[in-house]
A protein has these predicted regions:
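Long helical/loop segments within the catalytic core of UDP-sugar-dependent glycosyltransferases
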Residues: 119, 127-173, 193-273, 310, ...
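Short beta-strand-to-loop acidic/aromatic patch adjacent to the donor-nucleotide binding site
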Residues: 175-190
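Short, acidic, metal-binding catalytic loop of nucleotide-sugar glycosyltransferases
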Residues: 74-87, 111
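Juxtamembrane C-terminal module of membrane proteins
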Residues: 29-54, 329-339, 370-480
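Catalytic donor-sugar/metal-binding loop of nucleotide-sugar-dependent glycosyltransferases
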Residues: 282-299
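A conserved acidic beta->alpha catalytic loop
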Residues: 94-108, 121-129
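N-proximal low-complexity "stem/linker" segments adjacent to membrane-targeting elements
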Residues: 1-76
Length: 480
């Protein structure tokens, strides 16, 4: 093997150089995102002048084999919503064959009578005809007209199918309603009291609204700390920049608002993608719709074990790959638009670079400090620049994370404890471990799997937190 004078194998130097060039690319991508403006809903803006002009909001609650106590915690938060009762509905949408969840919901409606239940039947049921007829007439529902599943009514029995059925039922039931809007959340999502008010303000300016999320059980385990940190990094920091009209946007899958007329006109939800979030956002962006960010955060729970975290993340990764392939062509994205759409995924996908860069960085540092460094000068300069850039970015991220921990942790000692769990060394190891869900998700994409709802188990992890926060504040403090 060819070596430099110091005896360092040339292949290691080249690998180190590649890793540093990739790190520079990641930094430049980060700078691009930071150059994009964040379009936030200004809660100081006025509401519509009269109650009749407020959006009529139908909150959809898709559930599958959920714990009754998890749903009860969510309903506790929904009971605190500060919005005229005549201007919203809360509709749980279990599958019709999920008898255990339906029984739990029926018991809970005795305590929370504002909750309605809409059972989602099998797609052979004639009540689905409203969907098929709408898709027949709408070329925006390209999956129905083109591809290997064109015309297939055998939709996979997961969250997206529930949302599709409920969307068209809501549109049919409330044809006479002005400003008809849907919002949907996950089984464990607990919105703040001003969630609907934020929508009423924001929908006067934006077409789609997305609330931020914060994990409440971030101190439950080391795995939970890392999973919550992923949300701190993406949901709490980078995501808001996707609201710049220049950048194709995704949605986060809960705590978001669509105008029903827009969603119907654009074909509803794509049933054949593992997660619906990226594709529907891309479709809205391509059709000129704008995104606004609601800074008041939903409380959610994150997986408390690494196994559950991998299951969740591989599903995300598969959906990202799926949404960035054929759908972009079907939606007539130009090459430049496709590149920008891929940029949304690159911060996640680039985590694999750490599995190469971190060990090589340790090796290069060791050689340097032992006085046996033969790296080219340009590579030394690039490495120093990357270290400085990385340090600056991490300081900013940790400052942001410290601020957001205050949304759910009252005691300073708890906040410090969390920051210690997500210290830079542990985070580096975690980012290396991301190679596992990235690989598994890519395999899912290649196999066209992910059609079955691979659930992330919800364990009512935020029971006490949600009740104390809602009782104390009625609404979470905003994080700007």
């Amino acid at each position: 093997m060819q070596t430099y004078d110091s005896g360092i194998p040339t292949i290691l130097i080249w690998l180190f150089a590649i890793s540093q060039i990739l790190y520079l690319g990641c930094f430049l991508l980060e700078m691009y995102f930071r150059s994009l403006k964040v379009n936030s809903v200004d809660m100081e803006d006025p509401l519509p002048a009269t109650e009749a002009e407020l959006p009529f909001i139908v909150l959809l609650y898709p559930v599958l084999r959920e714990l009754e106590r998890t749903m009860e915690t969510t309903f506790t938060s929904l009971a605190k919503l500060d919005y005229p009762r005549s201007r919203y509905r809360v509709v749980a949408i279990p599958n019709a064959n999920d008898t255990e969840t339906i029984a739990s919901l029926q018991r809970l409606t005795q305590t929370y009578p504002f909750v309605e239940i809409l059972e989602v039947p099998a797609t052979t049921d004639p009540r689905w005809d409203v969907v098929w007829n709408a898709w027949d007439a709408n070329p925006k529902a390209y999956w129905w007209h083109n591809g290997k599943r064109a015309g297939s009514k055998d939709l996979p029995p997961k969250k997206t199918r529930q949302l599709i059925y409920a969307l068209y039922q809501v549109a049919q039931t409330h044809r006479d309603k002005t400003h008809l809007t849907i919002d949907y959340i996950d089984a464990d999502s607990c919105p703040p009291a001003d969630h609907f008010k934020a929508a009423a303000i924001g929908l006067q300016k934006y077409d789609v609204l997305q609330a931020r999320n914060v994990a409440g059980n971030l101190n439950a385990s080391l795995a939970a700390a890392f999973h919550a940190f992923d949300h701190m990094t993406w949901d709490g920091a980078k995501y808001g920049h996707l609201s710049d009209p220049k950048q194709p946007f995704w949605v986060l899958g809960k705590g978001l608002f669509f105008k029903v007329d827009d969603l119907i006109a654009l074909g509803g939800f794509h049933p054949w993608i593992t997660i619906e979030d990226p594709e529907v956002g891309e479709r809205f962006w391509k059709n000129g719709k704008t995104l606004g960010i609601i800074d008041s955060s939903l409380i959610e729970e994150v997986p408390e074990t690494f196994d559950e975290g991998v299951t969740q993340r591989k599903r995300w990764v598969a959906g990202f790959f799926q949404s960035l392939g054929a759908p972009l062509k079907e939606m007539d994205f130009t090459f430049g638009e496709r590149v920008r759409a891929w940029m949304n995924f690159l911060p996640c996908m680039s985590l694999w670079v750490n599995t190469l860069g971190i060990p090589l960085g340790v090796w290069a540092a060791w050689r340097f400090f032992t006085g046996d460094n033969a790296l080219p000068l340009w590579l030394v300069v690039l490495s120093v620049f990357n270290i400085i850039a990385f340090t600056v970015l991490m300081v900013g991220l940790y400052m942001r994370t410290w601020t957001r921990t205050g949304l759910v942790l009252e005691r300073t000692t708890d906040r410090i404890g969390y920051m210690l769990m997500v210290n830079p060394i542990f985070v580096m190891i975690w980012w290396c471990a991301w190679i596992v869900p990235l690989t598994l998700g890519f395999v899912m994409y290649l196999k066209d799997s992910g059609q079955v709802w691979q659930r992330t188990e919800k364990i009512d992890a935020n029971n006490t937190l949600v009740r104390s926060k809602l009782d104390q504040f009625g609404v979470l403090r905003h994080d700007h």
